[in-house]
């Protein structure tokens, strides 16, 4: 192998949705991008999550110079509570919100005290030295705030890893993709682009997140009873839209699901989730509101059996049950392989 060659090893995220994990290796230095999980296929009963196979890394932990996280979705951070013990003492680098979401997961796993979490601000244009690699985070638009990609200067040239992104001219948080940084990379010359390509085969452009807010407004205006919105626990922008819509329609909002409740708490503490009308309430207090004055945001948009929506559909949630006149919004497209699980939950709601 040439002396300036860089090896890229994908431990997940290729020809599949989820389990994103990429290694870049040169000599005695390895950097890791993301550490996610995938959801099991329909023919994998009894399995809750699928993790990347990190056997290659376990044999080379002394070479790991850092784990760099693009954003806080499960398919990019969900593997950390399970795999980080085998990767220590490697530091984990993330933006502010992503670091906060990782902290919640590691605290639950009793790993936070052992972890070396390091925060960066992409707007400050940092350059992080990691062995022979120089990592430059840049902001991208996604359905969660504080998402980034990485420009990685390597002995073989500049490699750009986009992470998940969209070119959204009207993002919920008002923060655009850093086009100036992308233009700078173009001028410097990019040796390799490692790009998100989900739905790349679909014609046209991905709509702005604001389109979802318009749909929420219509559904909330028509709803006569309670409104249930199922989403991902880490989809902070979607939770913000539910809060804003509920406030406009005179409804309180109760988060359902431990992971969602924790993420809402940390996002509020860090200023990434706002509730100026004080519509957020605890699930145990939601019963005191009339049906037309309460909305729930919950986990379970992918039909996960232990998530809040599944427990509501099965009639075994301790705080709430769905009934006639209620409206349920499943605010996510089923991940490939999850369609049957999602439709099974929907059927049980009727």
For each feature predicted by the language model, list its residue ranges.
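Aromatic- and Gly/Pro-rich donor/ligand-binding loops
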Residues: 300-301, 332-336
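His/Asp/Glu-enriched, well-ordered alpha-helical/loop segment
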Residues: 344-350
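Gly/His-enriched, cation/cofactor- and phosphate-binding structural elements
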Residues: 253, 330-331
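Conserved two-lobed SF2 helicase motor
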Residues: 293-302
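Anaerobic metallocofactor- and corrinoid-dependent redox/one-carbon enzyme cores
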Residues: 295, 312-313, 322-327
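Conserved acidic residues
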Residues: 65, 191, 294, 326-329
